[in-house]
Amino acid sequence: MIELKLKNFKCFENKTFNFKDEMVLISAPSGSGKTSILSAIKFALWGSGKTLTKGEIMHGKNSCSVTLTYNDITIQRTKRPNRLVYTKQNEIYEDNEAQIYINEYFGNQSHNNFLESSSLDKTEYLEKMAFGKSTEIIELMKENTKENIRSINDETNNTEGQLSLTKKLLKSVINDWNNRMCSIVEPQIPQIPVFENKVLNVSIYEEKDNIEKEIESLKLKNINHSILKSKLETILKQKCDLMNQIQNVKNNIDVTKNNLIYLNDLSTVSIDDLQEKINKINHEKKILNEKHTKILIEKSNLQNFLNETNTLNQKLTELKIKKENLTPTIVLSSENEQSTQSFSLLKTRETHELNSLKTTLQNDISCMTEIMLKESVCKSQTDSLKKNIVKIEDEVVRLLNITKTVNLTLMNENLSTLYQQSDHFNKIAAQKTILTTKVQNINIEKSKIEEKMVKTQKCNEDDVNKLDFKVQKLEKVKSFNKYLNSIKEHLKQSFPGVETLEFTGHKSQLSVIKDFFEDALYTQKLGDKAPKYKCPKCLHPLSIQHKNDKINIVSYIDEYILEILVKVNELLSEYNNETTIEVMDDEEIENIKDFKKLILEREAFQIQIKKLEEEIKNLPVLYDKSNEIQSLQNTIASYNANNIQLLKEETKLKEEKKLLTQNITMSKLIHEESNKIKDTYKIMIGIDKDITNENIQTYLKKELSDLESELKERLIFETNLLIYNDIVSQIKTILDRQTIITEEIATIKKFIEEHSNIDELIDNLNQEHNLCYTNLLNKHKYEQYNTQLLNYINLCVEYNESLNKVETDMETLKDQLKDDEKCCLELQKLQEYMKQIESFIKIQKKYELELNKFNEWTKLKNEYKKSVSNYETIINDLENRLLKLNNEYSASITLKLKISEAQNIALTSLVDTINIYVQQFLDLFFEEPIVINLTMFKETDKKGLKATPRYQPKVTVNLYYKGVLCPSDLSSLSSGEYARVSLAFTLAFHQINNNKVTPLMLDERTANLDQDLSTLIYSVIKENFPNQLLLVVAHQVITGPFDNIITLQDYN
């Protein structure tokens, strides 16, 4: 029984299927997942091979897994992560190991499209069936024999070439020696020259080297002599600089002492007393400023009152003139009588002469129009007055807001704080000067270092890094030379000629060393004369050895050689496009290092300068507060002026309001008069309703001519009366206001006289304040000068110490210079002696040349004899090697032929069994006679005309249907016939493999057949494969000998 669990596999999210060892039909429409069940079994057993479709993971999911359980075996294969787990009786195997066990138990995957595959694929599949596990071993044997034959051929060609080459070389060596013997005369041993002044037991070259060293040392001393002179000059400059600096410091000390003498009076006074005195003066100034502002306000009020008296006097004169210009009929005494008489006359007229009284209506109408005009004028005047009042009120509110926002006491406090801030500003300025002096001192040190840099090194700063890089390269060269010399002793015996290798910095020398060690790596002896090869991956030397008729591959690595090759490659990468690494003296290297140290010191000084500049920047930014003090004093003055303006605006507002009330009363009187006239009209005309102009006009047409003169008199009288009364009331109010103003003026003048000396008091206080403030500043300066004096004294001490040090250095340098002068004389003597040695060395070299010629002659003679004997031994070895290789080649050829013969026998026997099984199934599936045979044939693989032909076994299909031979691709068969032939091959392969564990899976194999034929086929399958799981997939339910039918829709 097989249990199949699917998770996110194709169209199945989470499904489990159970199959017994019986024939099962899986039926469902297209797209239901029938084939996915068979794919899942194949995926679990053999994975996603070439025949399986990819994309096993369900759409929208990240991974999938298939678990197949058979008896005590559980196989689980997952994708993302790709993992295979094989479990049997609590033993777990994974991935490749698990696949090996699956293939052993369930066999290899069957070929479903055997007929459609090429002849080469068919052959490969049949070979796997025929040989099973031993297929890989046979292929490995074939490959080994081929490789062995190839290597033997290559080696035989190499040895033949070497043999012919050595014979030619031997011949050429003998000919060369004979030609030389004809032309060269045998040289004689030369006489040894003698040097008279030579030191005992020391060679002339050693003596020369010793003298050269002495000369070099003396030259160095001369160089040191010049360096000491330059140092002495620099020290003299330093001394002059220090003297100047000491003089400057002394001058500064004198200046500060003079300043202290000038400010000596303030030594007893403390800063707190001065500050307290300034605060008291500020308080008194505050009180006096308040009084001063009050006086200014009173003065402005006095001026306003005086202006007002002038305006009142002008108005009074104008009113008096108007009063005099009125009609002479109106007199003060007879005023009331005149009016009563006029009114009594009118009353008698109203009673006795009604018609004559009605004529007055015209006058009243004109009066009404005039009243209406007056009303409109009064209205416009009231509107303009109201607007003016609103404007003035806004201005008053604005000025009041200004006065509210400005706090005079706070301003005075700010003024005192500003004085304190100005003191703080002076302290910070002093601190800033100290920091700037420090920066200047560090800059001096930095300039000294830059001078040293100019003296110690001639190159630029930009070139130092390049030179430093060159120094590093030189150190690498030295380390490489040390390593090369150390391994020479180890490799002397194995590799002769390693002693001659030298490296002085040239790239060509490195390439020579590389070539030597690479040749050594691949041509070293491995115990016997086995051929050498290179590994294609790691390039290690390999050898094929024959022991006891077995072929072994041997690897050999010399660690020293590999390590030096790595170091050579590293050094070659350092060269880039250069050919040599420039050699430098130790003194130059030391100069470069010293120069680099100086650069680092200069950078350290630059960092210190940056820190000090940041400290200067971080100091609180304060400014001189004198301008702010002046601006605050100006604001206090503007505040006082603002108060004066406010008083003016308030008086103006009062006047405007007064005029407005007058205008309102006037308009009320005019309105009352108009109402009176209207009432009279109602009574006179006799109309209860409102009087209209039409009624009046009709009335006027009758009585207009009679009442014209009387109307005029009445109008003049009444208007004059009103004007007169108004003028009288105005004169009265003006006189009252004048009395009030005179009293106010008297009080203001009295106040001003009492405080007449306030300006003098303020000036005195300001002078006293300025004096205290200057004393306070001077006190701060006094303290600064004290601290400055101490700093200058310390500087003077430091400069004196450095001056003493410089003088001691000068004395030591002078002593050294005296010693170096003696060395110059010694140098001249040694140079004369050196000339004598060089003349003798020339004679010595001539002797050495003649001796070398004699030695070379003897060496050549010995080498000739040795090379002839060597070539003869090499020729004998190569001939023996050729015989051995021929024997090995014949043995390999016989082995290859036997392997191919065994393969052919196994394949032909398998093909015969396949033909038998296939023919059995075809006889059951077809009514007509049909014969199908798999036949073996050998295809010739011949490349080129001269190449030897290679015969490769291949398989083809021969089909005789209805007595006719069909083509090899079976294209003449119908789809149903082709399906039956293909099914016969599938069943035959399954029966030959004889694996009852692996289920037989048939996917739509009878889709092109009718019901009866398909029933027949399935009954045949069931008979031939009893007690075995058979899975059949079909679109719809078909009849047949099925033990179980699964419909996926019902199952889902």
Curated annotation (Swiss-Prot):
Domain of life of the organism encoding this protein: Viruses
Pfam family, any one: SMC_N
InterPro entries: P-loop_NTPase, RecF/RecN/SMC_N
Membership in a protein family: Belongs to the IIV-6 050L family.
Protein name: Uncharacterized protein 050L
Organism of provenance: Invertebrate iridescent virus 6 (IIV-6)
Lineage: Viruses, Varidnaviria, Bamfordvirae, Nucleocytoviricota, Megaviricetes
